[in-house]
Amino acid sequence: MAKSGMGTFHTGARIENVVDRDKGASIPRLLVDTGSEYTWVPATTLEKLGIAREKKDLAFIMANGQQITRSVGFAIVRVAKAFTVDEVVFAEKGDLLLLGARSLEGLNLTVDSRKKKLVAAGPLPAASMIQCADATAI
């Protein structure tokens, strides 16, 4: 995982077609961004992998306040040994390439901001039980 500016760092990832996992591409530098819900991958890469634009003209607010629209599709996102299926944004020229919070959650990875790297988030929480007045679990 490559380090970059203050408090930020990049990581590499592999993006794969959900239906045909043989169709995949490595993305060497994604900015790890817990403030972004989605992972942003070059549209040209997603198109080459045969990933369909499932949601079109989805509105996004950029960090500078500008509103833009992009398409979103489904892909397998792999970082090291972890993987998840997630929605990915078809990033256009000039867009930052990002590894977003939803992918991080699905990968069960969290940010170690001191060491500027991704680390395992630990055991996943299971359902919790709440006791009701009649002692049945919900």
Give a label for each model feature.
Residues 1-138:
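Pepsin/retropepsin-fold aspartyl endopeptidases
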